[in-house]
Swiss-Prot record:
Disulfide bonds join C50-C93, C184-C193. This is Rhamnogalacturonate lyase A. One of its GO terms (molecular function) is carbon-oxygen lyase activity, acting on polysaccharides. Keywords: Carbohydrate metabolism, Cell wall biogenesis/degradation, Disulfide bond, Glycoprotein, Lyase, Polysaccharide degradation, Secreted, Signal. Pectinolytic enzymes consist of four classes of enzymes: pectin lyase, polygalacturonase, pectin methylesterase and rhamnogalacturonase. Degrades the rhamnogalacturonan I (RG-I) backbone of pectin. Active against linseed rhamnogalacturonan.
Length: 527
């Protein structure tokens, strides 16, 4: 005889299967979309605001009840319609300058999305935020609780918190665009992932990073930031952002290889199908082979990138037609730049070559990789505030030949560890004229380096471009990458021991880690 437990569980499963029917239900003030997926997914979209107000997956309500999931902080009002065509459902939300789409394919537990804009939203950023049940989905992936701020007290602005003695922020969930194909939140029985295969209308390039998730207690937020003012290095792009996909699963992590080519038949504004695109193939050469090589294409309308193969060969993603700047990086440091024109339906061949050129090196601290790799606290800075007790001391003296790379701080702050001191020993052959090259990756509050070599003080550089954004305290190190050359007159360097100090200067001031600062890439003295 079958047990009551078995009969009950079978009845629940049967109910889930029986209720599954791909389609749209018009509730008067909202639409409910049934994906007809094996693990049932239904979600409800408000007709007047475009907010998602309910997401029921495998019988559990995932949507936070206090506020919806939506573009920006909500569209406020929109014209919302829903249509079904065969195995596809499209919900369209229209405003005067933005159209947002939810798309569902019959049988898939995925909410595909795309966002078309003709102007940047007034709030100065474009994002989708899913506010999900933090009891069912408390975890953040792949970086864990570094961005879980629930129960914390604010220590900087309203976005950096102290939680159980650790600094945390939603910004510490970030990953470089070139590496961020998927980020997730999860619980013991469920996982929801944002799958990102298209950044062409975003801004900032391959090394830009932004908020991915944040468990703030009331809900766990899963984001896709298409653009923002968070250390933004270029103008915003309009047009179609996406497709991007919110994937629901019970176990395992979904693949990032999702085919969204069906968007071509759905009347999505701004969508360019594969046959309307072209590619660039070629070979990169000349850069430091110990580093990853990246090729990057961009213009006012789109951006693309790819890692090269080990031999330097590459093929671009499928690109919209146009003329692009083509840039070549070792790590994140640019070594060459050219232009290339892409035509629909064809592949263009374009090689690129470049390297870092200096001179006869007296000493070099770090590598020209466009990152603070290996410097003190660089291994921690992405995931915690510089004031965190787990950080090493920011002050130190670096002695060439005996200090470890990790003895050199990744950043100099005007009110914390200013100046940074370097000691080195020179031979008589090294006392002639020289160049001290100071590579930086990011500046804050007008900070720029001024060097003193023994008794000679180099000129004060002009202020760099102001990105108007906190950086290093929010887990960023990538800005415009200014490089400063200091001409050192002959006789300044002496035989024997020499001392260099690098001070951050600025007409601005600030407390502690919000004082003017620069992040270092590499320091090289050469003749």
């Amino acid at each position: 005889m079958l047990s009551k437990t078995f009969l009950l569980s079978s009845a629940v499963l049967w109910a889930r299967v029986a209720n599954a029917a791909f389609g749209i239900t018009d509730n008067g003030s909202s639409y409910t979309i049934d994906a007809n997926s094996p693990n049932p997914l239904k979600f409800t979209v408000n007709k007047s605001s475009c907010d998602i107000t309910s997401i029921v997956y495998y019988g559990s309500e995932f949507q936070y009840s206090g506020k919806g999931s939506h573009i920006g902080s909500g569209l406020g009002s929109a014209t919302v319609s829903a249509t079904q065509s065969g195995d596809y459902i499209k919900v369209t939300c229209d405003t005067s300058s933005l159209t947002h789409y939810f798309v569902v394919h019959n049988g898939d537990p995925i909410i595909h999305m795309a966002t078309y804009i003709t102007a940047e939203p007034d709030i100065g950023e474009l994002r989708f935020i899913a506010r999900l049940n933090s009891n069912l989905l408390p975890n953040e992936e792949p970086f864990g609780d570094v961005s879980t701020t629930s129960g914390g007290s604010a220590i900087e602005g309203s976005d950096v918190f102290l939680v159980n003695g650790e600094t945390r922020s939603k910004f510490y969930s970030s990953e470089r665009f070139i590496d961020d194909h998927r980020h997730c939140i999860s619980g013991s029985a469920h996982r929801v992932c944002m799958i990102l295969n298209q950044y062409e209308s975003s801004s900032g390039g391959p090394f830009f990073r932004d908020i991915n998730s944040n468990n703030g207690g009331d809900y766990n937020a899963l984001y896709w930031y298409m653009n923002s003012g968070h250390v933004q290095t270029e103008s915003f792009r309009t047009g179609l952002h996406g497709p991007y996909s919110m994937y629901f699963s019970r176990s395992g992590t979904p693949s990032t290889n999702i085919d969204t080519s069906f968007f071509a038949s759905l009347g999505i504004k701004g969508y360019v199908a594969a046959n309307g695109r072209g590619t660039v193939t070629g070979k990169a050469s000349g850069a430091d082979s110990s580093m990853d090589w990246v090729v990057h294409w961009y213009n006012n309308d789109a951006q693309y990138w790819t890692y090269t193969a080990s031999d330097g060969s590459f093929t671009s993603p499928a690109m919209k037609p146009g003329t692009y700047t083509m840039k070549y990086y070792q790590g994140e440091f640019p070594v060459a730049e050219t232009t290339v024109t892409v035509s629909a339906g064809s592949s263009t061949t374009k090689n690129i070559s470049g390297s870092v050129k200096t001179g006869t090196t007296i000493f070099k601290i770090g590598e020209w990789d466009g990152q603070p790799t290996g410097f003190r606290n660089a291994d921690k800075q992405l995931r915690m505030h510089p004031s965190d007790s787990r950080m090493d001391s920011w002050s130190s003296t670096y002695t060439v030949g005996s200090s470890s790379l990790s003895d050199f701080p990744m950043a100099v702050f005007k009110s914390v560890n200013n100046p940074v001191t370097i000691k080195f020993t020179a031979t008589s052959a090294q006392t002639g004229a020289a160049t001290l090259r100071i590579g930086t990756t990011l500046s804050f509050a007008g900070g720029r380096p001024q060097a003193t070599i023994n008794s000679y003080t180099g000129p004060a550089p002009s202020a760099p471009t102001n990105l108007n954004s906190r950086g290093v305290t929010r887990g960023a190190y990538r800005g415009l990458g200014e490089v400063y050359d200091v001409s050192v007159p002959a006789g300044t360097i002496v035989t024997g021991e020499n001392t260099i100090t690098i001070s951050v200067i600025s007409g601005s001031s600030g407390d502690a880690f919000l004082s003017p600062n620069v992040v270092f890439d590499c320091i090289e003295l050469f003749q």
